[in-house]
Amino acid sequence: MAKKDVIELEGTVSEALPNAMFKVKLENGHEILCHISGKLRMNFIRILEGDKVNVELSPYDLTRGRITWRKK
């Protein structure tokens, strides 16, 4: 998938699930299932409930996403 096709949104982590999966509540009220991007995983960035994150969504499946950035 090309980088230009992704949808970038902001949200808050509402629940931490096994296997580095998270439920993220988006600003528009939807709740999606997300995994951590490779850069965050390689640099051991910890993501906890309540953290503000940037999420990338594919236009083909709007129920799953990738966490690309954790805000302070």
UniProtKB/Swiss-Prot annotation:
Record-level GO cellular component terms: cytosol
InterPro entries registered for this protein in UniProt: NA-bd_OB-fold, RNA-binding_domain_S1_IF1, S1_domain, TIF_IF1
Superkingdom of this protein's organism: Bacteria
Keywords: Cytoplasm, Initiation factor, Protein biosynthesis, RNA-binding, rRNA-binding
GO terms assigned for molecular function: ribosome binding; rRNA binding; translation initiation factor activity
SMART domains named among the record's database cross-references: S1
Disulfide bonds: none
Name of a matching Pfam family: eIF-1a
Localization (cell): Cytoplasm
Residue stretches making up the S1-like domain: 1-72
Family annotation (NCBIfam families): infA
Job description of the protein: One of the essential components for the initiation of protein synthesis. Stabilizes the binding of IF-2 and IF-3 on the 30S subunit to which N-formylmethionyl-tRNA(fMet) subsequently binds. Helps modulate mRNA selection, yielding the 30S pre-initiation complex (PIC). Upon addition of the 50S ribosomal subunit IF-1, IF-2 and IF-3 are released leaving the mature 70S translation initiation complex.
The protein's assembly and partners: Component of the 30S ribosomal translation pre-initiation complex which assembles on the 30S ribosome in the order IF-2 and IF-3, IF-1 and N-formylmethionyl-tRNA(fMet); mRNA recruitment can occur at any time during PIC assembly.
Family: Belongs to the IF-1 family.
Listed PANTHER family: TRANSLATION INITIATION FACTOR IF-1, CHLOROPLASTIC (PTHR33370:SF1)
Name under which the protein is recorded: Translation initiation factor IF-1
Organism: Clostridioides difficile (strain 630)
Gene name tied to this protein: infA
